[in-house]
Amino acid sequence: TYMLAYDAPYLDDQTRKGIASGLEQCRKIARLPRTEVIDRSREGSPGTVGMELEDGLFYLNAGYCGKSVKTLLDIGAEYTSIDQSLADELGVRIFQDSLRMSPASYMKLGILDSLQIGSITLKNEICCVFPDGLAARNREATADSGITRIRAMLGISTLRKLSALTVDVEHGTITFDTGKQPQTGIANFMLKDNIPYLWLELNGIPAMMHWDTGMNAKPRLSGKFYAEHASSLPELGPVRKGSEITAAGAAEYRYHALGGICAKIGSREVILPEVRVVFDTEDMHTAEVPGYDGQMNNIV
């Protein structure tokens, strides 16, 4: 997700708004039809698809213009995306070949005649088209290393057209809903300004944490801790150094490692083996849960 994800290291607010504005302008210039969402699920039978969990990432099969393609669920990505060879194979119409995605990168924009996920079909869905080989679990790997090549990613541009998303790791399924099905349980997954968040508690502290899944690293949760929460956390240990890959390259950060933190999502609880409290300012810390792999089932 290093090219398409929204987070401070990737896109600032001005760039993100510029992308949205540019996309709308492209629609008008190209006179593109609006996306139509068709839900063929029957009452009591929601649109559920099988899911594979590989190295902490969620994969499903989606239909692109009638072709089934293994797809990465990338809720950190601004747009649903496919690689150039798949776009050529499907005959995707390219209507913009230089959309700025970050200060140093450009992508093509195309339109899919149809995108099917379970019983839901989206007609005339806009997608990004990226160069072949750009999306891979390890960009340094060679072609014969057996590394997973990612040809398609399901992003926020598609998910925001739906009303609910349920990830059930225990049964290996993802359910997509347009609002046709009656909702059960308490929703704790939401989009705010196209950024995905989860509601949860950490050691009893209510938190709305940014939930990111993507191709560059295992899914993770991140959110803010303030000084007033210090009494609810274990004593901070020594400062350690960490690094992560961003669009600009490797970025280092300082953090305190905490163990034994209880995370509660809905009625489910799990003890997290490690929470990294990253120093931001004198009175604020960012809590990150590295490698969170959806072990709490039924995240809605």
Pin down the residues of each PLM region.
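Pepsin/retropepsin-fold aspartyl endopeptidases
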Residues: 1-300
